[in-house]
């Protein structure tokens, strides 16, 4: 098995923080190659990453292709020293990564049925496409007629990425993937940039905190703000 795991994302990547947490639990070394863009202070998930024991490298690179090359360069040196490395792409947006959210869609279906709630839409912030892909496939399997809406919090061609990943996840699970017409749509609400708060969303963050006691992260605030 592997003893070292690499992944990447924005400086405040939730995926990166979760990877660091899982690596800590499994006793693996975790190396995070994160984009420095937008970092003005050491806060949020950067603190958690280091708390979990991850080695954090902030890179002045905007292209993930460049970051992947650096990832494999570092990993190659470690492998020559006898380590075994696992490389996870941004957001774990692969067929296997999407499968986790197929299971999530099933859980949503079970809970909705138990609560007697009839769903029409599932809304998810979309930063790399894996979550939306898994929900799209899962909705088709467990929630017929329910549409998936992705809120773009980064700039990528999600209208192509999400259906492709959903199809690859279906192939991995050996299940059919024939989405209904208009089963998936994207709404752009990135604001100033990935992980950067949109000032227009501040009233919704405050209202939810003061009426429900719930605190939204930047991505969650953009989900809510997109429909306000």
Q: Where are each of the predicted segments found?
A:
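PLP-dependent amino-acid enzyme catalytic core
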Residues: 1-228
């Amino acid at each position: 098995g592997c003893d070292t795991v690499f992944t990447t994302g924005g400086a405040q990547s939730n995926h990166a923080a979760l990877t660091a947490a899982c690596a800590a639990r499994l006793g693996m070394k975790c190396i995070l190659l994160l984009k420095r863009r937008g970092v003005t202070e050491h806060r949020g998930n950067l603190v958690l990453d280091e708390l979990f024991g991850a080695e954090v490298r902030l890179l002045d690179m905007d292209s993930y292709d460049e970051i992947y090359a650096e990832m494999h360069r570092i990993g190659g040196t470690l492998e020559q020293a006898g380590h075994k490395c696992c490389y996870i792409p941004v957001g774990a947006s692969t067929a296997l990564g999407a499968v986790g959210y197929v299971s999530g869609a099933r859980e949503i279906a079970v809970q909705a049925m138990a609560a007697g709630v009839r769903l029409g839409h599932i809304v998810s912030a979309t930063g790399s496409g894996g979550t939306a892909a898994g929900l799209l496939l899962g909705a088709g399997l467990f929630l017929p007629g329910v549409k998936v809406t992705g809120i773009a919090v980064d700039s990528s061609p999600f209208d192509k990425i999400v259906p492709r990943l959903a199809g690859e996840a279906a192939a991995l699970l050996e299940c059919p993937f024939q989405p209904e017409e208009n089963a998936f749509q994207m709404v752009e609400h990135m604001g100033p940039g990935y992980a950067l708060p949109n000032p227009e969303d501040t009233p919704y963050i405050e209202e939810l905190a003061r009426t429900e006691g719930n605190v939204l992260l930047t991505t969650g605030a953009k989900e809510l703000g997109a429909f306000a």
